[in-house]
Amino acid sequence: MENDPSRRRESISLTPVAKGLENMGADFLESLEEGQLPRSDLSPAEIRSSWSEAAPKPFSRWRNLQPALRARSFCREHMQLFRWIGTGLLCTGLSAFLLVACLLDFQRALALFVLTCVVLTFLGHRLLKRLLGPKLRRFLKPQGHPRLLLWFKRGLALAAFLGLVLWLSLDTSQRPEQLVSFAGICVFVALLFACSKHHCAVSWRAVSWGLGLQFVLGLLVIRTEPGFIAFEWLGEQIRIFLSYTKAGSSFVFGEALVKDVFAFQVLPIIVFFSCVISVLYHVGLMQWVILKIAWLMQVTMGTTATETLSVAGNIFVSQTEAPLLIRPYLADMTLSEVHVVMTGGYATIAGSLLGAYISFGIDATSLIAASVMAAPCALALSKLVYPEVEESKFRREEGVKLTYGDAQNLIEAASTGAAISVKVVANIAANLIAFLAVLDFINAALSWLGDMVDIQGLSFQLICSYILRPVAFLMGVAWEDCPVVAELLGIKLFLNEFVAYQDLSKYKQRRLAGAEEWVGDRKQWISVRAEVLTTFALCGFANFSSIGIMLGGLTSMVPQRKSDFSQIVLRALFTGACVSLVNACMAGILYMPRGAEVDCMSLLNTTLSSSSFEIYQCCREAFQSVNPEFSPEALDNCCRFYNHTICAQ
């Protein structure tokens, strides 16, 4: 059997066939590109000679494929060149389009110009970091004697302090109410130091640099004209961008519901904004911004990489999403670092909710500034309350990486972001229903108890307006506005900031509509300065309902550290609440009234169809004026909208 010739021939013939089945197509293409037939060592001339002797030419089609295969080989060899050519043509076309758009109407093309500058900055930073990064780090490395460097740093700190004192003395001569806000910062910092876990271990470098960065950011946004205009423009672009939510929500719910029902008007914005943030995470833009902000705080304040990344991430994401950035490192973080993570979550708001608050009519510039300024302040005050006394494993940023998510493409990233927001929207809706119902019940119960002892109108808001009035005054709010601001602070602390911002928007709408300031003993609106400071003070998740959210989120990531989280959560909540108050005080120091003065004589002598804040101010000035500078027609215009004793004459 073994010597059977037929079997031997069969085994010889099947062996090369079996090997050829592994990748016949690849062998075929490689052979053609080399100018040979598969499994043949003959040259093309020898093959053609053998074909001429044979009857048919079975491989005549292979010659027809050779030009295409050679073209493919050429493209492979010069792929990088083709990419550069394509990129160059694309950049040339975009540059020409941008140039033409700017020449035709620069204001119309401003958004495109800014986006182009952002992209160029991003690409330029990557290129410079790759080419000059090591050289710049060596150049910027401190040189000289350590003691000399120490005295140099102390001299800079002293100069900065003296400059701040000089600036305050000159600036507050025009607006003395700024001194109250400065005193508020001193009081809140002293209170937090008194509550510190380890008084002797406080890193005053972290505290001073954190408050200094907060001041510089506030100075850039609030006081300087270019910074204010830039953030005002950014807020307007965000408002316009969020208005596109109406297209989707109107299609799903209908025009009538979107126009009149709060849930269908505001909550879809959270879905849209969450979708956009998810896409930005997928392309890496969010990670780049977070890393740059974290790097700035780390090199100045001397904090660790993980805690700094978490606080920087809180500018854009919520208290439960920011810890996901450092999830692999939570198990090994010290208690001080975990305290920073919690404080950062309580001291800021999520980017998706930022869009919802802007839709209420809250000032977008103040919201954006509050979110950015809160990050260094949260890091500083957290290190004041819970200083580092352990050895951290994350002193340097090497080995700490940010993920880009699990999405494989932009469509999946957008879909995932929208799906994740459903839980957030449902949570907000459920909390609003529950908290507003509880608040109404508490007010009814307090009113019932107050009636028994002849106290009329007793409510939760009234109690807060008395208890928290000194806190509102320390922020720099005028005393007549303090009851309303204290009421909003109480709602934010004991219920949530969503309800408080809703109430603040109602006060703002009344002011803009030109409503009378007082109706009986009840104030109908507050000043613009009080609105801005309240916007800063409410910008944070520091309320008692967030304790369960924070503990639940962190415990789900690191179950073995549940006792550590429970140990410091109340301290972090208190610190986060104080961060928002210090943020408001900083805004009070830097706030400056803007806008041109209204010419009341010209305004009141025109035909008025509706009231406004400017008309109310002018009419109040006309009613209180003792000089006959306002014409009877101007007073008649005012009497159409407001009641005054002069109108009865």
Swiss-Prot record:
Gene expressing this chain: SLC28A1
UniProt-recorded Gene Ontology molecular function terms: azole transmembrane transporter activity; cytidine transmembrane transporter activity; nucleoside:sodium symporter activity; purine nucleobase transmembrane transporter activity; pyrimidine- and adenosine-specific:sodium symporter activity; uridine transmembrane transporter activity
GO BP, sorted A to Z: azole transmembrane transport; cytidine transport; nucleoside import across plasma membrane; nucleoside transmembrane transport; purine nucleobase transmembrane transport; pyrimidine nucleobase transport; pyrimidine-containing compound transmembrane transport; uridine transmembrane transport
Documented effect of changing residue 319 to M: Changed pyrimidine- and adenosine-specific:sodium symporter activity. Loss of specificity for pyrimidine nucleosides
Tissue specificity as recorded in UniProt: Expressed in kidney.
InterPro entries found in the cross-reference section: C_nuclsd_transpt (IPR008276), C_nuclsd_transpt_met_bac (IPR018270), CNT_C_dom (IPR011657), CNT_N_dom (IPR002668), Gate_dom (IPR011642)
Phylogenetic classification of the source organism: Eukaryota, Metazoa, Chordata, Craniata, Vertebrata
Disease involvement: Uridine-cytidineuria: An autosomal recessive inborn error of metabolism characterized by increased urinary uridine and cytidine excretion. It is a likely benign metabolic trait without clinical manifestations.
One GO CC term on file: plasma membrane
Annotated consequence of substituting residue 561 to Q: In URCTU; changed N-glycosylation; increased protein degradation; affects urinary excretion of uridine and cytidine
Keywords per UniProt: Cell membrane, Disease variant, Glycoprotein, Membrane, Symport, Transmembrane, Transmembrane helix, Transport
Annotated localization: Cell membrane; Apical cell membrane
UniProt-annotated glycosylation sites, renumbered to this chain: 605, 643
Transmembrane region(s): 81-104, 110-128, 148-167, 179-195, 202-222, 262-283, 295-318, 338-360, 367-386, 424-446, 458-479, 535-558, 570-592
Cytoplasmic-side segments: 1-80, 129-147, 196-201, 284-294, 361-366, 447-457, 559-569
Designated name of the protein: Sodium/nucleoside cotransporter 1
Posttranslational modification: N-glycosylated. N-glycosylation is required for localization to the plasma membrane and the transporter activity.
Pfam family, one: Nucleos_tra2_N
